[in-house]
From Swiss-Prot:
One of its GO terms (cellular component) is cytosol. The gene is nsrR. NCBIfam families: rrf2_super (TIGR00738). The keyword Iron applies. Binds 1 [2Fe-2S] cluster per subunit. Keywords: 2Fe-2S, DNA-binding, Iron, Iron-sulfur, Metal-binding, Transcription, Transcription regulation. GO terms for molecular function: 2 iron, 2 sulfur cluster binding; DNA binding; DNA-binding transcription factor activity; metal ion binding. It comes from Geobacillus kaustophilus (strain HTA426). PROSITE patterns: HTH_RRF2_1, HTH_RRF2_2. Its cofactor is [2Fe-2S] cluster. The keyword Lipid biosynthesis does not apply. Residues 28-51 bind DNA. This is HTH-type transcriptional regulator NsrR.
Length: 147
């Protein structure tokens, strides 16, 4: 299973924001610089994370981006489900466009579905807080990357 860059970058944004002090804000430019990601692409991700309620964007002179929830309330499996456009591992998972002739009798489909569910179940066991246990090291590394 390979996550899309979109989902990976969404998780990176959350890690970046989680590494900040509680009331500290940042901006898309700083996050993009830290991860060498296009600001344009990142703005779409930030917009969606805001719509999903994970982050808040504050406009104005003292504006910026910060987490909208405590890290312990952000479940990694949920973020993956909400940002990953297509969790279909194989053609037969798709509701439309399945042309595999084996589908009516295929047992592989069930095994792969079970594997996907196990993958997501493991991610459901982690919150952003779990991933931020060594927050000081993460913060230091990100500060270096921003310059």
């Amino acid at each position: 299973m390979q996550l899309t860059n979109y989902t990976e970058y969404a998780l990176r944004v959350l890690l970046f924001l989680g590494a900040l002090d509680e009331e500290e804000k940042t901006n898309i430019k700083d996050i993009a610089a830290a991860f060498s990601i296009s600001e344009h692409h990142l703005s779409k991700i930030v917009y969606e994370l805001g719509k999903l309620g994970y982050i808040e964007t504050i406009r104005g002179r003292n504006g910026g981006i910060r987490l909208a929830k405590r890290p312990a309330e952000i479940v990694i499996g949920a973020v993956v489900r909400e940002t990953e456009e297509n969790l279909s591992l194989v053609e037969c998972f798709a509701a439309h466009g399945n042309e595999c002739v084996l589908t009516p009798v295929c047992r592989l489909r069930f095994a792969l579905h079970e594997a996907l569910e196990a993958f997501l179940r493991v991610l459901d066991a982690y919150t952003l807080a779990d991933l931020l246990e060594d927050r000081a090291s993460l913060r230091s590394l990100l500060k270096e990357r921003r310059g």
